[in-house]
Amino acid sequence: MHLIRSLWVVAAGLLVAGAAQAQTTGLDLAKNKACMACHQVDAKRVGPPLASVAERYAGQGPAMVDYLAGKIRGGGRGAWGAVPMPAQTHVSPEDARLLAEWILSLAPPK
């Protein structure tokens, strides 16, 4: 019984470490791709806070990753006010998906 409990503790620790690593990697990628020039995680800049984007779209299913990745690469207008988001064609489709997954991970647990 003690062994099973120990394994659960180790597994939980690995999950927490993995989530923290994803947060760091996502933020690093967002900085590297210049997302942070217009966005912040928790405060409005030119664009909406990424945490607000996460709250709006979280829990809407796995297709939301593709939707947000498309918005990152293709840009958009009208969803967050008058300022349009320019297309970020320098972001690869793979990096756009990673960014979208990271952004969605910023939503508070429900």
Task: Identify the function of each model-found stretch.
Residues 1-9:
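Bacterial N-terminal signal peptides that target proteins for export
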Residues 8-17:
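Bacterial N-terminal signal peptides
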Residues 18-30, 56-58:
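Electrostatic cytochrome c docking/interface patches
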Residues 31, 55-58, 62, 73-77, ...:
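Sec-exported extracytoplasmic/periplasmic mature domains
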Residues 33-41, 99:
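The canonical Cys-X-X-Cys-His
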Residues 43-45, 90, 106:
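Solvent-exposed loop/turn segments at secondary-structure junctions
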Residues 48-57, 73-98:
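Axial heme c-ligation environment in periplasmic c-type cytochrome domains
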